[in-house]
Amino acid sequence: MAKVYNFSAGPAVLPHQVLAEAQSELLDWHGSGMSVMEMSHRGKEFMEIIHDAEQDLRQLMGIPAGYKVLFLQGGASLQFAMAPLNLLGDKDSIDIVNTGHWSKLAIKEAKRYAKVNVVASSEDRNFCYVPEEAAWQRDPNAAYLHYTSNETIGGLQFPYIPAEQHGVPLVCDMSSDFLSREVDVSRFGMIYAGAQKNIGPSGLTVLLIREDLLGKARADIPTMLNYQVHADADSMYNTPGTYPIYIAGLVFKWLKEQGGVKGIATRNEEKAGLLYHVIDSSGGFYSTHIEQPFRSKMNVVFKLRDEALDEIFLLEARKNGLAQLKGHRAVGGMRASIYNAMPIEGVKSLVNFMQDFARQYG
């Protein structure tokens, strides 16, 4: 089988070790005689799997007491509705920072349920920066402040955690940089992430919520969208995504073996540094419009000087075992997604290809 490095933005690359372990256990998990895919979600075998996954995640992130970990379905996009439906309480407004495509979708959905105050936006310069926090126009009476820590499509990442003000809790869509760097969970009211980037396969959403934010859902909320219902049932109100949770648990164990979040963050810095160096040193053959402090460590978005070369670049990259480099249709160009599971060898292979391509076509 030819070696391929998969730079897809999601569903994305999984650690080879995790895939190999899942393969070895596919027909018989730990001598049970059953595949995880066919286990009862309430049987002792799967209860062990989901318990271990939660405990490993708590250890990796240093999740404090007083926070619930929920394994949900519906993707991060469903959270754009679930968050306001659950967290508004007796308030009627939400603060949101607009830094790109996913922020805009969160704003659009939240407007169905609440007044939305866009505290700051970088749309004026095509989302190339994070607006200076001191200039944000916050509402002291907002139910929460929502931001997207990493814009997967645009390649922009918050380099810091915003400060909490007026007791307004922070809510973060961390879908594409979850577990990629150390964060102080205690600074957040809620964090959520779709699994298909740094956690596991699609079909799973991981949510961390401070317990004092539970129980505020509007009265007419559908039962399946109520955080309190899922928290009370330990993510077992209905049948959860058993196999994605199993794979996520394997990823968490793999991540612990890599030195935890601190260890993987160092590796992620190195990988991103290699790619941005080849872009910046290409004499304009490659370029990125994202200002340097806000460049994503997960999604390196760049363009070729001559768009006519785009298809040639993608075709030749694929011939060299470098897959899924086409940028999102909303922005064009290229996107190399280098999540935790992307080995540094894959990034070095891409860097070498980019240098060779620039020499040939520059």
Swiss-Prot record:
Reaction(s) this enzyme catalyzes, per UniProt: O-phospho-L-serine + 2-oxoglutarate = 3-phosphooxypyruvate + L-glutamate; 4-(phosphooxy)-L-threonine + 2-oxoglutarate = (R)-3-hydroxy-2-oxo-4-phosphooxybutanoate + L-glutamate
Pathway: Amino-acid biosynthesis; L-serine biosynthesis; L-serine from 3-phospho-D-glycerate: step 2/3; Cofactor biosynthesis; pyridoxine 5'-phosphate biosynthesis; pyridoxine 5'-phosphate from D-erythrose 4-phosphate: step 3/5
Positions that bind pyridoxal 5'-phosphate: A76, S77, W102, T152, D173, Q196, N238, T239
CDD domains assigned to the protein according to its UniProt record, in alphabetical order: PSAT_like
Record-listed N6-(pyridoxal phosphate)lysine modification sites: K197
Superkingdom to which the source organism belongs: Bacteria
Subcellular location(s) of the protein: Cytoplasm
Enzyme Commission no: 2.6.1.52
Cofactor note: Binds 1 pyridoxal phosphate per subunit.
Enzyme class: transferase
Gene Ontology molecular function, alphabetical: O-phospho-L-serine:2-oxoglutarate aminotransferase activity; pyridoxal phosphate binding
Cofactor list: pyridoxal 5'-phosphate
Binding site for L-glutamate: R42
Keyword line: Amino-acid biosynthesis, Aminotransferase, Cytoplasm, Pyridoxal phosphate, Pyridoxine biosynthesis, Serine biosynthesis, Transferase
GO CC annotations, alphabetized: cytoplasm
Pfam family, one: Aminotran_5
Major location category of this protein: cytoplasm
GO BP terms: L-serine biosynthetic process; pyridoxine biosynthetic process
Subunit and interaction comment: Homodimer.
Record family assignment: Belongs to the class-V pyridoxal-phosphate-dependent aminotransferase family. SerC subfamily.
Its biological purpose: Catalyzes the reversible conversion of 3-phosphohydroxypyruvate to phosphoserine and of 3-hydroxy-2-oxo-4-phosphonooxybutanoate to phosphohydroxythreonine.
Name used for this protein in its record: Phosphoserine aminotransferase
Lineage per the UniProt record: Bacteria, Pseudomonadati, Pseudomonadota, Betaproteobacteria, Neisseriales
